[in-house]
Amino acid sequence: MNPSKYAVTFACYNQVDYTRQCIDSMLHHGDDLSRVVVIDNGSTDETRDYLQSLNLGGRIFNNSNLGCGVAWNQGALAFQAEWTIIMNNDVIVSPGWIENLIGTAERNNLKVISPSLIEGPLDYDFKSFAVDASRKMKDSIRLGTQHAVCLAIHESVWMDIGYFQPIPKLLGYEDTMFFQELAKARITTGMTGASWLHHYGSITQSAMKKERGLAEKDGLGYRYNYRLLQQSWLERKIKKIKRKRLESSWCKSELLQFGMSMYGHRLNNEFIWQ
């Protein structure tokens, strides 16, 4: 794939070890770091020194933690491409993940697409797993869904619905609001079995909760953020039920066909499929 076709961007806030693992996995699989823009949201550890040592396409150092929405917008605008991949920094990538992700979107006329995921501890051979899983499930798609761990977004989407809400206090709710706009505009989205990531899981948010003296079960953002969706309690409840039923149906179908699904969690050295 022509590298000028895409750009990759992610935000980080401390947790340099996870950022390093992410970058190392990209280098290991031959990904071009000159297509990557990293936004640092006021880290106080060694993150900035590490980023300075890399041949990145761009790096933006914010004076404070401006949140994901602001950072994602900064990255998408700093390095504009036909496809912008927005992702977390606590992920490990797999062979051909970019080509498979964007290729699937183009073949199926999707404007937003996410890869399949395994979340939890990295206590297995992810590379071997991902190669096998991508081969098995390369033609499988969950239409009408996506996740914020990784999104490939076509440039037309920015023109149709705009960018992420640049409000720092949303603290992780930016993706929910963006997904609502995708649905309202009837933009075609999907999740593909052709591309896989390992996601350690909410590393930055967990660290921010500790900074604020919050328990892991506590929400990080403002408790009434849901009001921004302008939906009644009943509307939100019905949508959640429908989503859960659809996810269950996808999982059952994939397990029957492949013995695995597009979303798994590692628990006690085993895969839990969902």
Where are each of the predicted segments found?
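A recurrent flexible, glycine/aromatic-enriched loop bordering the glycosyltransferase active site
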Residues: 134-156, 171
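Conserved donor NDP-sugar-binding/catalytic core segment of glycosyltransferases
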Residues: 95-127
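N-proximal low-complexity "stem/linker" segments adjacent to membrane-targeting elements
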Residues: 1-25
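A conserved acidic beta->alpha catalytic loop
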Residues: 40-49
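Short aromatic/hydrophobic "clamp" motif used to bind/position activated sugar donors
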Residues: 84
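Glycine-rich, basic loop-to-helix element that forms the pyrophosphate-binding segment
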Residues: 62-79
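Short, acidic, metal-binding catalytic loop of nucleotide-sugar glycosyltransferases
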Residues: 24-33
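A short, conserved alpha-helix in the catalytic core of glycosyltransferases
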Residues: 150-151, 157-162, 168-195, 201
